């Protein structure tokens, strides 16, 4: 969107704080239904951030796929699960949870150090080179492909990682 600077900054801070509140709601709310609705709120905020950054196609895909399909599927799965499983399990922290949190924390810090230590000059140079190629393309799908592999590479990969985590979670829930 082409908004004036202060309005753009306000919306960015507002959506970022909405992401933080929604993420805390996903983690801290004891009721799984409320956590699923909070996840839906987080996904809508992410979609609005994509609209704010002029990537309307990614925002529409985010709304249709994640909010419209995956979040509804999560809500149905949580609603159909038996509540007695949650109330009888009093062991809140196990060895597996500790190992999982250690692995996830290690991956988080390694990703943070990789992102901070990487020189992003080559990525910007490739993006500017593909803007020249963009003028010769007629098809919108080719332009979307170039944008997904250059300008929106990081959001596209983050969405694919979220989808992979959802698939792994669905497989682990199906095995139980």
Curated annotation (Swiss-Prot):
Principal location listed in the UniProt entry: plastid
Q: Which one of the record's GO molecular function terms can you name? A: NADH dehydrogenase (ubiquinone) activity
Q: Which UniProt keywords apply?
A: Chloroplast, Membrane, NAD, NADP, Plastid, Plastoquinone, Quinone, Thylakoid, Translocase, Transmembrane, Transmembrane helix, Transport
| Compartment(s) where it occurs, according to its Swiss-Prot or TrEMBL record | Plastid, Chloroplast thylakoid membrane
Instruction: Write down the chemical reaction(s) this protein catalyses.
Output: a plastoquinone + NADH + (n+1) H(+)(in) = a plastoquinol + NAD(+) + n H(+)(out); a plastoquinone + NADPH + (n+1) H(+)(in) = a plastoquinol + NADP(+) + n H(+)(out)
State the superkingdom.
Answer: Eukaryota
Q: Which GO terms describe its cellular component?
A: chloroplast thylakoid membrane
Instruction: Kindly give the membrane topology term recorded for this protein.
Output: Multi-pass membrane protein
Q: What is its EC number?
A: 7.1.1.-
Q: Does the keyword Lyase apply?
A: no
Q: Record's Pfam families?
A: Oxidored_q3 (PF00499)
* InterPro entries found in the cross-reference section: NAD(P)H-Q_Oxidoreduct_6, NADH_UbQ/plastoQ_OxRdtase_su6, Nuo/plastoQ_OxRdtase_6_NuoJ
Q: Which residue ranges run through the membrane? A: 10-30, 32-52, 61-81, 92-112, 152-172
Q: Which top EC class is given?
A: translocase
Protein family = Belongs to the complex I subunit 6 family.
Quaternary structure annotation from Swiss-Prot or TrEMBL? NDH is composed of at least 16 different subunits, 5 of which are encoded in the nucleus.
What this protein is reported to do is described as:
NDH shuttles electrons from NAD(P)H:plastoquinone, via FMN and iron-sulfur (Fe-S) centers, to quinones in the photosynthetic chain and possibly in a chloroplast respiratory chain. The immediate electron acceptor for the enzyme in this species is believed to be plastoquinone. Couples the redox reaction to proton translocation, and thus conserves the redox energy in a proton gradient.
Name of the protein in question: NAD(P)H-quinone oxidoreductase subunit 6, chloroplastic
Organism of origin is Barbarea verna (Land cress)
What's the encoding gene here?
ndhG
